[in-house]
A protein has these predicted regions:
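Glycine-centered loop-to-beta-strand initiation motif
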Residues: 65-75, 86
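Feature of secretome-associated and extracellular-like proteins
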Residues: 16, 21-22, 83-135
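Short hydrophobic alpha-helix segments
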Residues: 37, 45, 61-63, 75
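Short, surface-exposed loop/turn segments at beta-strand-coil junctions that are enriched for proline
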Residues: 77-80
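Short, Lys/Arg-enriched N-terminal segments with co-localized hydrophobic residues
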Residues: 1-20
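Short beta-strand and strand-turn-strand segments in soluble, beta-rich domains
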Residues: 54-59, 101-102
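Beta-strand-rich domain onsets/edges
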Residues: 16-43, 51, 57, 129
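Beta-strand signatures of extracellular beta-sandwich domains
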Residues: 46-50, 85
């Protein structure tokens, strides 16, 4: 049976959660790695993020993917319009899985030209990888 008080209480809790999530700032650049050879996220992959300035690469963040294959929290500031590069340590990832890997690392270079969130997915296997502009 419909209970007005209970429904109001439930809605209030949901609104509080939404407001809390909106106030949390997401990194302007994120990544997600899926291992297509297993059909699962690639956890514990070391990733470095660089920005290019004066024709030199400068390390601005690094981390490891979580159990869902994601890094979402490595930058807490806005980023400048520039060229960026992610380096993914595939050699260590596949060594830990006791699998051979043809590519010891993957590099993805991309250019930011707006203030939108930029999600850079990587689909990988021991003998290939691909990427695309995520959402």
């Amino acid at each position: 049976k419909y209970s007005r008080g209970r429904t109001s209480q439930n809605n209030k809790n949901k609104i509080g959660v939404i407001a809390m999530n909106k106030s949390m700032k997401k990194s302007p650049i994120t990544t997600h790695i899926l291992d297509t050879s297993t059909g699962k996220p690639a956890a514990n992959v070391a990733v470095k993020l660089f920005v290019q300035s004066n024709n030199e690469w400068h390390l601005i963040a690094q981390g490891k993917t979580d159990t869902d294959g994601r890094i979402t929290d490595w930058l807490d500031t806005d980023v400048e319009f520039a060229t960026y590069k992610m380096e993914f340590d595939l050699d260590s990832y596949y060594q830990n899985k006791e699998m051979p890997a043809f590519y010891p690392e993957a590099q993805i270079t991309f250019r930011l030209q707006d203030k939108k969130h930029h999600h850079i997915p990587l689909l990988l296997s021991p003998f290939g990888y691909s990427t695309y502009r995520g959402s």
